[in-house]
């Protein structure tokens, strides 16, 4: 159902069963999947690729040009997966040719009111980003991560899968998978054991993750030495290998350990 007071460019591609409320503006180079709902006063700009059964609340702006002085008007996109909710006044900027040329939001995500996602970010599946979080450009957020409200994340930071960041955090360094992060400066405060249990991780797996991070953050080793110990003492597993790969590939370095200054 498309309300007559909405403006939709005749070349926009709108699937079946899409509901578009009054005063929505949809530009030319837009694709919207079936079953999606677009709330009043939202603006869907060129380059938007929206999946099925999404909910985009009033005042959201999807696929705005990147806030990057190097951007010269080249074609780029914002891609949103299926079953994702974009709440009021969220702003999603499309990618730039100097990086991925797209900004990606996965499936089954929740971006709460006033979130900003800058150009070339990649957000995985089942991610929750709470109210007023500000993500700078080129950030990667992996599956099942949670970012607490009013946090600000520095460009190029990576936030690992199943991690949890407390509200109001300034995130300048990478946050490894399965961890909880808090305090200022942002530091390791444990593993996200509650979230892991909710997602079906066994007690043995959670205990192993906890012991791995005890070596990384509590034993005062440098990262290289900690990884050598982990590889020698722990049997290869999906979780162990994900932690090792994340730390080995970190470009900005990881957050501080508990009690470090």
Give the residues covered by each predicted segment:
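Structural signal for interior beta-strand "rungs" in well-ordered beta-sheet cores
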Residues: 2-183, 187
């Amino acid at each position: 159902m498309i309300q007559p007071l909405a403006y939709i460019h005749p070349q926009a591609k709108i699937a079946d069963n899409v509901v578009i409320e009054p005063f929505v503006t949809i530009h030319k180079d837009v694709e919207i999947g079936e079953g999606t709902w677009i709330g009043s006063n939202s603006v869907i700009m060129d380059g938007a690729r929206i999946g099925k059964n999404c909910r985009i609340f009033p005042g959201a702006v999807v696929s705005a040009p990147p806030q990057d002085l190097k951007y010269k008007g080249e074609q780029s996109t914002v891609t949103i997966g299926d079953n994702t909710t974009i709440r009021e006044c969220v702003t999603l900027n499309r990618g730039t040719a100097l990086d991925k040329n797209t900004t990606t939001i996965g499936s089954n995500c929740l971006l709460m009111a006033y979130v900003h996602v800058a150009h070339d970010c990649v957000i995985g599946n089942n991610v929750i980003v709470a109210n007023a979080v500000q993500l700078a450009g080129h950030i990667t957020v992996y599956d099942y991560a949670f970012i607490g409200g009013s946090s600000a994340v520095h460009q190029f930071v990576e936030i690992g899968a199943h991690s949890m960041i407390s509200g109001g955090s300034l995130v300048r360094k990478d946050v490894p998978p399965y961890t909880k992060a808090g305090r200022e400066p942002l530091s390791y405060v444990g593993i996200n054991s509650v979230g892991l249990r909710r997602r079906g991780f066994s007690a043995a797996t959670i205990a192993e993750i906890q012991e791995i991070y005890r070596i990384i953050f509590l034993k005062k080793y440098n990262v290289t030495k900690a990884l050598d110990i982990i590889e020698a003492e722990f049997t290869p597993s999906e979780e162990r290998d994900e932690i090792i790969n994340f730390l080995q590939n970190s470009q900005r370095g990881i957050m501080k350990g508990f009690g470090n200054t």
